[in-house]
Amino acid sequence: MSASTSTTAAASQDACYISLLGLAEYFRTSQPPNIKKCIQCLQALFTFMPPSKVEARTHLQMGQILMAYTQNIDLARHHLEKAWSISEPLANFDVKFDTASLLAQLHLQTDQNSNQAKAMLRRAVELSQHNVYWHCKLLLQLAQIHASDREYSLASDLLAVGAENADEAGATYLKVLFLLSRAMILMIERKTNDVLALLNSAGQIIDNNIPNPHQKEYLKVFFLVLQVCYYLALGQVKTVKPSLKQLQMSIQTIMAPNWPSDETIFGANQLEMFVWLPKEQLYVLVYLVTVSHSMMAGYMDKAQKYTEKALTQIEKLKQQEDKPILSVFKVILLEHIVMCRMVMGNRELAIREIAAARDVCLAAPQRSLLRRHSAQLHCLIGLYSMSTSFFEHAERQFLVCVSETNERDLKLFANLNLAIIYLRTKRDTDLKQILDAVSSENTNTYSSQALMGGFYYVQGLHAFHKNSFHEAKRFLRETLKMANAEDLNRLTSCSLVLLSHVFLSIGNSKESMNMVTPAMQLASKIPDIHVQLWGSAILKDLHRMSKDAQHEKDAYANHLKYSENLIADQRKSVQSSHHELVNWFHGDPPVTSGPPTTTAVAMILPDSSAAVGPVPVIASTSTGMQQAIQPVGQYGQFY
């Protein structure tokens, strides 16, 4: 065959490829898409015996389309595996990396574990060392999988490698993304000194070495979210305020109408085509951390307002595209709502919203959300059971929570509430055992100031019930010192009302009044119906002792009002079909029916009688926001 004939044949073949690809794209973008004909056009390419690179790319395209538009996972896997086997040995051919990334995603969807996905990505990472873009993208994807499997050290190591690679390539923006992602992982690992060092390093680079103002603002939001979560994890509600205010201002800047689209900001340079979360999801996340702060500070109205806005925004985004991260945000918000409802004495709404959180978890593919949030749900049901005096159920729920979670703060929180149950049911041996265990586990370790304040409160409560009033005062003053230092208003109000009861018990009515008055003022602001009920009972006794009949009558009327409200709510709660959740101890939670939930808010409770309610700590039962916080993905693939 002559050279001219060969050239003509090749040109004709190229024309066929282009025509078939164009036709396939036409069918894919039709309204509605005609995926069957699209696939047929791509399949027809193979009849021309195309070169290896064209064949591999076509198999990749078919796998992509089948994954995106159909349920035919097996056929998608076949084409992707074919693309991988052809492309893997070919040098300077990016199709292998795209294929490996997609195959890893497919393995995660279909396999019982992530081993194959990790193996595929490790091989691709090894092959991509001379391609900075793909090397970094694959490192992020592999780190994400290790983080999801709670293999935090491996995830951290991969992110450190990514930061080094980005630095060597002069990709400063990408380097900061790796540094902040690693700081997030270290935060989950409780490596506080390392977190601070990384945040400081990243903060300096953001301030001094990011010339693009829009990318700088995005990085600042990522940085501030981590900084706020860091302080909240420590229970430092007062310390975090300046950072939270900065974060709220930054997100308003990003959400302004004149702000460029994410495509414009991140689409110019290949090594800048990475974002942590798109701005619409960042907006929800900022609401979420604001809710968490409002709860810890004891501002229920603010928490409710921000939760309503966040849930509304989530529903809007779900209508556009139902990303998995939105369900994570929703579950965490509902977990907050539930605790808030119980603080305010709305247990019937609380159990409804626990059921709503259960529904979101059950709807997620492969029960992935339920696996992550099962311990939190058991903890919430334990709190609900406790508040409705189902103590045996509450105990079992907390024990399940402790056995299921590796999160130290959640375990501490559940154990402190178990201590309250043992105190209330007069199980002194169990109480001593759990207090000793909590003390030994948390003496030399990083813990939330709010939770440690709660621990001192429980010890004060224990001393009060033993009539060891001097010891009770010592513990409660320590609690107050911690609570006042960081504006933990609910912990303050609970400690003050218990301290008032201590002084009342030893006949010091003046000091008792000095304690109960600010306790009631704080409780009305929160509002915390349990502290109000308890405080009104103390006030009634104090006014009776001082022979102030009118004030005694007023205090009694208030006490009666709070009591009647709680009794009425208790009746509605136990009659609700969702109350059946108190009997869920293993497996999938039962599906219950009932009226739909309203958009609402979240927190935690004590009880009406002598200081024996759940631990007065406004602390999220969510795992430190780690579900909401995730390593960055490439723009257009926010996984």
Swiss-Prot record:
It comes from the Eukaryota. Disulfide bonds: none annotated. One of its GO terms (cellular component) is SMC loading complex. It is found in: Nucleus, Nucleoplasm. SUPFAM superfamilies: TPR-like. The keyword Cell division applies. It holds the Pfam family Cohesin_load. TPR repeats lie at residues 453-486, 493-526. Keywords: Cell cycle, Cell division, Chromosome partition, Mitosis, Nucleus, Repeat, TPR repeat. The keyword Electron transport does not apply. One of its GO terms (biological process) is cell division. Required for association of the cohesin complex with chromatin during interphase. Plays a role in sister chromatid cohesion and normal progression through prometaphase. Interacts with Nipped-B to form the cohesin loading complex. This is MAU2 chromatid cohesion factor homolog. It comes from Drosophila ananassae (Fruit fly).
